[in-house]
Design a protein with these regions (language model features):
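Phosphate-binding loop of NTP-binding sites
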Residues: 74-76, 85-164
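N-terminal leader/targeting and accessory segments in enzymes
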Residues: 1-106, 110
Length: 164
């Protein structure tokens, strides 16, 4: 399978209605980047913009819309939907939207499709941050260029502009 590029992905997203489920660590910078590129972005979250704090204020000022409240998933719509890492593709609402023609993806999925270099992933219940940090440092010490990201605090998709 041929790798996509970030530029190709952004070109394909132009003119689409983009929905991001949740305003978590990975979606904040993605929403900001997409808004900066002039895309129509809506965040769907259970929490109100006030509860979401400064990130919501900044994104609102950039033209990002918010749909919030207990029924946010029932209101969910879009041409391209970025699911939160904790929401599986087989969620009933996502299945409905896919059946209606929506593309459902995630920040991590797009990163995996576009990343031009080897990827090391760490999963599990306990110790992921420590293990990931140790692996990254060992690779750095051996002379490798390392791009550390994920739930460690940096959205991986945004790092694609620095990876070759």
């Amino acid at each position: 399978m041929q790798k996509l590029t970030a530029a190709t992905v952004f070109a394909e997203l132009q003119g689409k209605e983009i929905a991001l489920i949740g305003l978590g660590v990975s979606h904040r910078p993605v929403a900001k980047l997409l808004a900066q590129k002039g895309m129509k972005v809506t965040i769907y979250d259970k929490k109100s913009p006030e509860e979401l704090g400064e990130a919501a204020k900044e994104l609102t000022a950039m033209g990002v819309a918010f749909v919030t409240g207990a029924d946010y998933l029932q209101k969910l719509r879009g041409d391209v939907i970025f699911r939160t890492p904790g929401m599986y593709f087989n969620h009933p609402r996502l299945k409905e939207l896919m059946k209606a023609g929506a593309a459902v993806t995630s920040e991590l999925e797009l990163f995996m499709q576009c990343c031009p270099c080897p990827i090391i992933g760490v999963t599990g219940s306990d110790g992921k941050t420590t293990t990931t940090s140790l692996i990254a440092e060992m690779l750095r010490q051996s002379g490798k260029t390392v791009h550390l990201g994920g739930n460690i605090g940096r959205a991986l998709f945004l790092s694609l502009i620095h990876i070759s």
